């Protein structure tokens, strides 16, 4: 089996905290130097690389003399602010050895949820790649809150891959890839060499092997691959402990787990809606509505809604959940949660009678709806 990275031109590489730090005791300068050397080798082959790197909080903890990761958000943000300086300095120093310029970009979910800022971020990243610069991206932990954080850099890597229409996402971790079961507990567990991104059985295989320094377990990587597939990007999950892993992947060697994007690529606007806008509420829809959305490509009408959960305003994203509790779609609602509670289970012709007005006959128009 040949690595999908060999034929990929635009790559997003995500490295976790354990691969750039000395077990949380500050940054591992030698390791970062090796990543810079490998990315320089990929650049020499004509590949474009965006690096998503953890490590700021771990470096900040070292500089502040903290042995344990703090729990309070203000202390985490302080550690990130202190550590980000060191992270940027080390990367710049190491890439300069290869005559490569770097750029630091810090993002929050709010940056990508705003359509104008999303397009500006995309334009900036593409310009940096055109100029031969390696963008180094991290979540802006200094200002982020629970409501607007990505949650982990695996998710951030997938969203960046979608943002720049990358060919592949490489998630480097301290694990060898995805196994059929936890290899630490099951001696019969085997490595999954290749599968379709988003395949239902993958989530069942994924364990929660997150460390105390980082936030991402295997499940977040599986979900990241599913998201990256929205723009047609394939994903490789591999061990960053493998010698020259990036160079070997680029040479065609199959390492770790390959998750192939086999679903149709989403239109750019729908991709943005699916991945970057936060869900504000849920509507439960009946089996007939599920069929019309998933097989018929229809809009969601109020008559198909049997329940409303959460508080949302007109124009916000809501999830559409079937009778079995499974999310089938999400989209921009034409009515608030209060209005939806009044008009659900009613035909569109009765909306004006109930509300005194009718904004639209659909709760979610098909042009503003994405299947998930």
Curated annotation (Swiss-Prot):
<feature type="domain" description="PUA">
    <location>
        <begin position="280"/>
        <end position="358"/>
    </location>
</feature>
<dbReference type="GO" id="GO:0005524">
    <property type="term" value="F:ATP binding"/>
</dbReference>
<keyword id="KW-0641">Proline biosynthesis</keyword>
<dbReference type="Pfam" id="PF00696">
    <property type="entry name" value="AA_kinase"/>
</dbReference>
<feature type="binding site">
    <location>
        <position position="14"/>
    </location>
    <ligand>
        <name>ATP</name>
    </ligand>
</feature>
<keyword id="KW-0067">ATP-binding</keyword>
<dbReference type="InterPro" id="IPR036974">
    <property type="entry name" value="PUA_sf"/>
</dbReference>
<dbReference type="InterPro" id="IPR002478">
    <property type="entry name" value="PUA"/>
</dbReference>
<dbReference type="InterPro" id="IPR001048">
    <property type="entry name" value="Asp/Glu/Uridylate_kinase"/>
</dbReference>
<dbReference type="InterPro" id="IPR005715">
    <property type="entry name" value="Glu_5kinase/COase_Synthase"/>
</dbReference>
<dbReference type="InterPro" id="IPR015947">
    <property type="entry name" value="PUA-like_sf"/>
</dbReference>
<dbReference type="InterPro" id="IPR011529">
    <property type="entry name" value="Glu_5kinase"/>
</dbReference>
<dbReference type="InterPro" id="IPR019797">
    <property type="entry name" value="Glutamate_5-kinase_CS"/>
</dbReference>
<dbReference type="Pfam" id="PF01472">
    <property type="entry name" value="PUA"/>
</dbReference>
<comment type="similarity">
    <text>Belongs to the glutamate 5-kinase family.</text>
</comment>
<protein>
    <recommendedName>
        <fullName>Glutamate 5-kinase</fullName>
        <ecNumber>2.7.2.11</ecNumber>
    </recommendedName>
</protein>
<comment type="function">
    <text>Catalyzes the transfer of a phosphate group to glutamate to form L-glutamate 5-phosphate.</text>
</comment>
<keyword id="KW-0418">Kinase</keyword>
<dbReference type="InterPro" id="IPR041739">
    <property type="entry name" value="G5K_ProB"/>
</dbReference>
<dbReference type="GO" id="GO:0003723">
    <property type="term" value="F:RNA binding"/>
</dbReference>
<keyword id="KW-0808">Transferase</keyword>
<dbReference type="InterPro" id="IPR036393">
    <property type="entry name" value="AceGlu_kinase-like_sf"/>
</dbReference>
<comment type="pathway">
    <text>Amino-acid biosynthesis; L-proline biosynthesis; L-glutamate 5-semialdehyde from L-glutamate: step 1/2.</text>
</comment>
<feature type="binding site">
    <location>
        <position position="54"/>
    </location>
    <ligand>
        <name>substrate</name>
    </ligand>
</feature>
<dbReference type="GO" id="GO:0055129">
    <property type="term" value="P:L-proline biosynthetic process"/>
</dbReference>
<dbReference type="InterPro" id="IPR001057">
    <property type="entry name" value="Glu/AcGlu_kinase"/>
</dbReference>
<feature type="binding site">
    <location>
        <begin position="173"/>
        <end position="174"/>
    </location>
    <ligand>
        <name>ATP</name>
    </ligand>
</feature>
<feature type="binding site">
    <location>
        <position position="153"/>
    </location>
    <ligand>
        <name>substrate</name>
    </ligand>
</feature>
<keyword id="KW-0963">Cytoplasm</keyword>
<dbReference type="GO" id="GO:0005829">
    <property type="term" value="C:cytosol"/>
</dbReference>
<keyword id="KW-0547">Nucleotide-binding</keyword>
<dbReference type="GO" id="GO:0004349">
    <property type="term" value="F:glutamate 5-kinase activity"/>
</dbReference>
<keyword id="KW-0028">Amino-acid biosynthesis</keyword>
<feature type="binding site">
    <location>
        <position position="141"/>
    </location>
    <ligand>
        <name>substrate</name>
    </ligand>
</feature>
């Amino acid at each position: 089996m040949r690595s999908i990275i060999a034929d990929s031109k635009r790559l997003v590489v995500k490295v976790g905290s354990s691969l750039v730090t000395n077990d949380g005791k500050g940054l591992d300068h030698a390791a970062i130097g090796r990543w810079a050397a490998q990315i320089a080798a990929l650049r020499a082959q004509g590949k474009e690389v965006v690096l998503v790197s953890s490590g700021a909080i771990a470096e900040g903890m070292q500089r502040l003399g903290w042995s344990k990761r703090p729990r309070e958000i203000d202390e985490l943000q302080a550690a990130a602010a202190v550590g980000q300086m060191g992270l940027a300095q080390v990367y710049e120093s190491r890439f300069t050895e290869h005559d490569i310029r770097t750029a630091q970009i810090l993002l929050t979910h709010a940056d990508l949820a705003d359509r104008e800022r999303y397009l500006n971020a995309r334009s900036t990243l593409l310009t940096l790649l055109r100029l031969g610069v390696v963008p180094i991206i991290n979540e802006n932990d200094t200002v982020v809150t629970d409501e607007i954080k990505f949650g982990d850099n695996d998710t951030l890597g997938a969203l960046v891959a979608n943002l720049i229409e990358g060919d592949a996402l490489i998630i480097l971790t301290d694990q060898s890839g995805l196994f059929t079961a936890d290899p630490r507990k099951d001696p019969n567990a085997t490595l999954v060499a290749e599968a379709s991104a988003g395949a239902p059985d993958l989530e069942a295989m994924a364990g929660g092997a997150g460390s105390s320094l980082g936030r991402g377990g295997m499940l977040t990587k599986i979900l990241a691959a599913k998201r990256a597939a929205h723009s047609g990007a394939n994903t490789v999950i591999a061990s960053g402990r493998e010698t020259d892993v990036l160079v070997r992947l680029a040479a065609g060697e199959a390492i770790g787990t390959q998750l192939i994007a086999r679903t149709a690529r989403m239109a750019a606007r729908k991709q943005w809606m699916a991945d970057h806008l936060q869900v504000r509420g849920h509507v439960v829809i009946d089996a007939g509505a599920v069929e019309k959305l998933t097989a018929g490509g229809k809009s969601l009408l109020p008559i198909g809604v049997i329940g409303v959960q959460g508080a949302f305003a007109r124009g916000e994203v809501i999830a559409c959940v079937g009778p079995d509790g499974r999310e089938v779609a999400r989209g921009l609602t034409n009515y608030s949660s209060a209005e939806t509670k009044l008009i659900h289970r009613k035909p569109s012709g009765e909306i004006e009678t109930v509300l005194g007005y009718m904004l639209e006959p659909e709760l979610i128009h098909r042009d503003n709806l994405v299947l998930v």
